[in-house]
């Protein structure tokens, strides 16, 4: 009897469950990766290509993420494959994993005496952007992580360290950057609790005492090699500097924004440019590395005045900081500047003019200064007027190439960055010395470089402090020279291990310290040399004969 209503038989193979196919896909990708190691091929691994190929093969609804691939790699291969796979290798190309954290939202301290916040400043408790900190919108990656963690420092730090670890980065050395308004204007109890939790997040200690937390952090496997605190000149007095030294802070980021007194007054900064110069000098004489924030394209400035102020910044010894963040002015809703823009009293530079300006600024940068950032992390849809492109530094460097100029700042020349972007390795490395006068003191910038390829491997900043601004008893009791920074670049190499292809832990740091000691003794006439050291690096200096001296590591010479 014939069957009715039945179609022709199909050979369609029934698919295995999604989870099973997902595991099989990860296994196949891992097999290809391990095969590339054992076969000895030197070709680059195209991980995205492999993920697309096998996701198609197994008809997956969702592709595996990098963390899924890393988790499926056998332990014996991880050591060799992780450096090739890590997401955003620039994150640790400078030799340190930077972890940004935010303090709780609070009002700007200068409202009390100026009556309002700066005209360009978004965010804060009274802004359109609820639950965001001062000068942030709440939509930057760091802000969103902070909001998810309800501004709990422990949760923020732990979460970010784990995230970097999952993405294949070495988190052996961590530097905290403390953002979110003027941290030093918050109550002392809150500040100390915040810092304790940051140290505890690395060491696993759960006490509340700051000195104890720092002792445990010193011995932790994940070392805190430095803390950066954002502040203002009026919250950078000797008392504030002493507190920050106690926290383990090694670098200050000071908001300057403009070198013109009239612009500082009109934008409602709440401090003078003269106070900025004094802050730089006192901070450097206390051993800190100093980075400042500058904003081109502010109201009533114009292109010529902008270029002039950056020339002044790099040439005038009263400024000349170790680092700089260039933040072109952005018009964001809810700010005083937005009202000026809306009524036609403020107009931003065109995109082309801004690229031109940044290119001209970068051409002025001396080789001892590091340009940390060239624009804010604020998402483009929130920007009403200002920067149109998310890759301003890249565009400016391309413009410089067209104009026949080069950027010789520290970041552009770092060996790790050169490796990531240009696959360039140094050949002949030699010690180079540059001396300059800044903020009342004699600065010596020592570095190991390949002068032919213009690649920087390591640097040391040595200072003979000024008599006028030195106030710390560790420095006034006898003639002292200060090492404000020692940094060997190249991708992070875990402490206690060596990788002959990387530049960390190859002895460059020790050689730089030996030369600094010689200069301090023979040229400065110092009896002692002190280092401002991150909590987790104190043991390194201990091996070089240094002893704890207040918050510093010191040695008689």
From Swiss-Prot:
Q: Which GO terms describe its molecular function?
A: 4 iron, 4 sulfur cluster binding; metal ion binding; tRNA binding; tRNA uridine(34) acetyltransferase activity
- Describe what happens upon changing residue 65 to A: Does not affect tRNA modification
Q: What happens when the gene is disrupted?
A: Sensitive to caffeine and thermal stress. Resistance to zymocin.
Kindly state what the record says about how the cofactor is bound. Binds 1 [4Fe-4S] cluster. The cluster is coordinated with 3 cysteines and an exchangeable S-adenosyl-L-methionine. The cluster is required for structural integrity of the elongator complex, while it is not required for catalytic activity.
Q: What is the effect of changing residue 91 to A?
A: Decreased tRNA modification
An annotated GO cellular component of this protein is: nucleoplasm
Read off the CDD domains from this record.
Answer: Radical_SAM
Q: Indicate the impact reported for residue 79 to A.
A: Does not affect tRNA modification
From the UniProt record, give one GO term of the biological process aspect.
tRNA wobble uridine modification
Residues the entry annotates as binding acetyl-CoA: 173, 485-488, 508-510, 541
- Xref: SMART domains: Elp3
Could you tell me which residue ranges the Radical SAM core domain spans? 91-381
Task: Report quaternary structure and partners.
Answer: Component of the elongator complex which consists of ELP1/IKI3, ELP2, ELP3, ELP4, ELP5/IKI1 and ELP6. The elongator complex is composed of two copies of the Elp123 subcomplex (composed of ELP1/IKI3, ELP2 and ELP3) and two copies of the Elp456 subcomplex (composed of ELP4, ELP5/IKI1 and ELP6). The Elp123 subcomplex forms a two-lobed scaffold, which binds the Elp456 subcomplex asymmetrically. In each lobe, ELP2 is tightly sandwiched between ELP1/IKI3 and ELP3. The Elp123 subcomplex binds tRNA through ELP1/IKI3 and ELP3 and can bind 2 tRNAs simultaneously.
Entry similarity comment: Belongs to the ELP3 family.
Q: What else is known?
A: Present with 4760 molecules/cell in log phase SD medium.
UniProt name for this protein: Elongator complex protein 3
Organism listed in the record? Saccharomyces cerevisiae (strain ATCC 204508 / S288c)
């Amino acid at each position: 009897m014939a069957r009715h209503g039945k179609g022709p038989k199909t050979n369609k193979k029934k698919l295995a469950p999604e989870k099973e196919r997902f595991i099989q896909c990860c296994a196949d990708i891992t097999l290809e990766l391990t095969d590339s190691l054992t076969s000895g091929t030197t070709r680059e691994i195209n991980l995205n290509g492999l993920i697309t190929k096998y996701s198609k093969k197994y008809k997956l609804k969702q592709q595996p993420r990098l963390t899924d691939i890393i988790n499926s790699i056998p332990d014996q291969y991880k050591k060799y494959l992780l450096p090739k796979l890590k997401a955003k290798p620039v994150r640790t190309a400078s030799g340190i994993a930077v972890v940004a954290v935010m303090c709780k939202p609070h009002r700007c301290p200068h409202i009390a005496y100026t009556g309002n916040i700066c005209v360009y400043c978004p965010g804060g408790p009274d802004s359109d952007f609820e639950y965001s900190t001062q000068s942030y919108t709440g939509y930057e990656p760091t802000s969103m992580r902070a909001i998810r963690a309800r501004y709990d420092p422990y949760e923020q730090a732990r979460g970010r360290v784990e995230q970097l670890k999952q993405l294949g980065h070495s988190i052996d050395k961590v530097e905290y950057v403390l953002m979110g308004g003027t941290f030093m204007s918050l109550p002392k109890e809150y500040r100390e609790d915040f810092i304790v939790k940051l140290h505890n997040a690395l060491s696993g200690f759960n006490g509340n005492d700051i000195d104890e937390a720092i002792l445990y952090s010193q011995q932790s496997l994940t070392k805190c090699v430095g803390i950066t605190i954002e502040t203002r000149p009026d919250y950078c007095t000797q008392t504030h500097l002493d507190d920050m030294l106690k926290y383990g802070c090694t670098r200050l980021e000071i908001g300057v924004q403009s070198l013109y007194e009239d612009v500082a007054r009109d934008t409602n900064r709440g401090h003078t440019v003269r106070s900025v110069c004094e802050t730089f000098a006192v901070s450097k004489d206390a051993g800190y590395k100093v980075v400042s924030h500058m904003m081109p394209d502010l109201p009533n400035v114009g292109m010529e005045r902008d270029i002039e102020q950056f020339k002044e910044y790099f040439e005038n010894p009263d400024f000349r900081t170790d680092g700089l963040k260039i933040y072109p002015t952005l018009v964001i809703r809810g700010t005083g500047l937005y009202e000026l823009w809306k009524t036609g009293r403020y107009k931003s530079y065109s995109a082309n003019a801004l690229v031109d300006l940044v290119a001209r600024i970068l051409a002025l940068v001396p080789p001892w200064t590091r340009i940390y950032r060239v624009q804010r992390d604020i998402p483009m849809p929130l920007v009403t007027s200002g920067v149109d492109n998310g890759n301003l530094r890249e565009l400016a460097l391309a413009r410089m190439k067209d104009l026949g100029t080069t950027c010789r700042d520290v970041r552009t020349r770092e060996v790790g960055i050169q490796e990531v972007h240009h696959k360039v390795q140094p050949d002949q490395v030699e010690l180079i010395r540059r001396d300059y006068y800044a903020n009342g003191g004699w600065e010596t910038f020592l570095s190991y470089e390949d002068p032919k390829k213009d690649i920087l491997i390591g640097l040391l900043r040595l200072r003979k402090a000024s008599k006028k601004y030195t106030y710390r008893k560790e420095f006034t009791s006898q003639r002292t020279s200060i090492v404000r920074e020692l940094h060997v670049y190249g991708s992070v190499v875990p402490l206690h291990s060596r990788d002959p292809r990387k530049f960390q832990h190859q002895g460059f740091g020790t050689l730089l310290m030996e030369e600094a000691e010689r200069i301090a003794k023979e040229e400065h006439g110092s009896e002692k040399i002190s280092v401002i050291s991150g909590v987790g690096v104190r043991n390194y200096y201990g091996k070089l004969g240094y002893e704890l001296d207040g918050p510093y590591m010191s040695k008689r010479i």
